[in-house]
């Protein structure tokens, strides 16, 4: 049995400049009536920040056990795939052949149940989420439970949002959990001073008997693999339906379902709401550059803005900021 203190990181990456990948994606787009709001080009856009993700991990979280780097097959030309802590995983290594190729991040992430050597405790990153300051294992897990924020938040339908998918998640959560019992059993985990002003959300939603949704901070999520397996066994059909979708679809689920399950089960330890922050890249990335410079938050998400007029200019500014923060190569980079 693996040491329960081991914590793995999982990060997914796609290279939208890979000619073969782009060709396959284009061919399947012609076959499927895809939802453009869930599959816009910005959702695949590669900014060239990945090497700084590894530099940040090596500097700020050297205690990590293994890093599972999941891709369609391609790897950055600077990456040393023989690094002892790095496990390069191709989609074909853990996703059933019948579901490949896939251009759906939900398929890639929900199939983590089939990643055999993954530790019981792991943190799931997207390639736009970065460690921004020194972190400890206890920032992600405590007493073998994931750290998280138990904050309720009603779903608000918006254009180009994940709301339909999140609604599917919540339908399953309400099927298995009672809000009344959740609060009776774990009141202090949902009404916790660490949530600051967000406590008002939980107070305001007290009159509603059903779970209307959870607050999503868009930062890396701490997971127990056993929770993935538990939900998979109970809701196999919706997992399988999701796996069949080559592109994101409004009828599927995403990994937040497992997060909501952990929260609803009380299988988490409250974490300060200011642990991380989500930023959206815009034509003026000054706020992100300042965050990289001063490290107010330990974890940040740098979300691709869908209306950037000067992509190359903004990209250069961002890379310059990353280079100033992490000027030294990591051991994950080729010599």
Swiss-Prot record:
Q: Which InterPro entries match?
A: Stealth (IPR047141), Stealth_CR2 (IPR021520), Stealth_CR4 (IPR031356)
Q: Which domain of life is it from?
A: Bacteria
Query: Which UniProt key words apply to this protein?
Result: Exopolysaccharide synthesis, Transferase
Q: Which GO terms describe its molecular function?
A: transferase activity, transferring phosphorus-containing groups
The EC number(s) given in the record are 2.7.-.-
Q: Say if the entry is tagged with keyword Magnesium.
A: no
Q: Name one GO biological process term.
A: polysaccharide biosynthetic process
> Is this entry keyworded DNA-binding?
no
The record ties this protein, via PANTHER family, to:
N-ACETYLGLUCOSAMINE-1-PHOSPHOTRANSFERASE SUBUNITS ALPHA_BETA, PTHR24045
The record's family statement is: Belongs to the stealth family.
List other remarks: Stealth proteins are part of a protein family that is conserved from bacteria to higher eukaryotes. Family members were first identified in microbes as proteins that help pathogens to elude the host innate immune system. Microbial stealth proteins are involved in the biosynthesis of exopolysaccharides. Stealth proteins are predicted to function as hexose-1-phosphoryltransferases.
Instruction: Give the protein name, as stated in the record.
Output: Capsular polysaccharide phosphotransferase WcwK
Q: What is this organism's lineage?
A: Bacteria, Bacillati, Bacillota, Bacilli, Lactobacillales
Q: Which gene encodes it?
A: wcwK
């Amino acid at each position: 049995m693996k040491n329960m203190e081991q914590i793995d990181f999982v990060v997914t990456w796609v290279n939208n400049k890979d000619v073969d990948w782009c060709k396959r994606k284009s061919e399947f787009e012609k076959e499927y009536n895809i939802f453009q709001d869930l599959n816009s080009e910005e959702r695949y856009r590669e900014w060239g920040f990945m090497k700084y993700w590894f530099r940040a991990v090596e500097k700020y979280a050297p205690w990590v056990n293994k890093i599972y780097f999941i891709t369609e097959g391609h790897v950055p030309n600077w990456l040393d795939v023989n690094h002892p802590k790095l496990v390069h995983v191709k989609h074909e290594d853990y996703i059933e052949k019948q579901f490949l190729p896939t251009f759906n991040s939900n398929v890639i992430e929900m199939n983590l149940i089939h990643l055999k050597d993954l530790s019981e405790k792991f943190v799931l990153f997207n390639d736009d989420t970065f460690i921004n300051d020194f972190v400890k294992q206890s920032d992600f897990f405590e007493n073998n439970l994931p750290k998280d924020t138990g904050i309720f938040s009603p779903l608000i339908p918006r254009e180009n949002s994940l709301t339909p998918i999140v609604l599917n998640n919540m339908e399953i959560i309400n099927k298995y959990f009672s809000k009344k019992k959740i609060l009776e059993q774990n009141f202090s985990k949902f009404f916790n001073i660490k949530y600051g002003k967000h406590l008002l959300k939980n107070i305001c939603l007290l009159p509603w008997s059903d779970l209307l949704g959870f607050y999503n901070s868009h930062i890396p999520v701490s997971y127990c693999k056993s929770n993935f397996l538990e939900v998979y066994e109970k809701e196999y059909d919706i997992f399988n339906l999701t796996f069949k979708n080559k592109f994101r679809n409004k009828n599927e689920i995403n990994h937040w379902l497992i997060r909501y399950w952990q929260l609803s089960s009380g299988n988490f330890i409250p974490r300060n709401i200011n642990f991380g922050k989500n930023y959206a890249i815009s034509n003026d990335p000054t706020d992100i550059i300042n965050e990289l410079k001063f490290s107010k938050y330990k974890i940040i998400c740098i979300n691709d803005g869908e209306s950037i007029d000067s992509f190359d200019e903004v990209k250069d500014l961002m890379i310059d900021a990353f280079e100033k923060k992490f000027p030294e190569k990591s051991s994950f980079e080729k010599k």
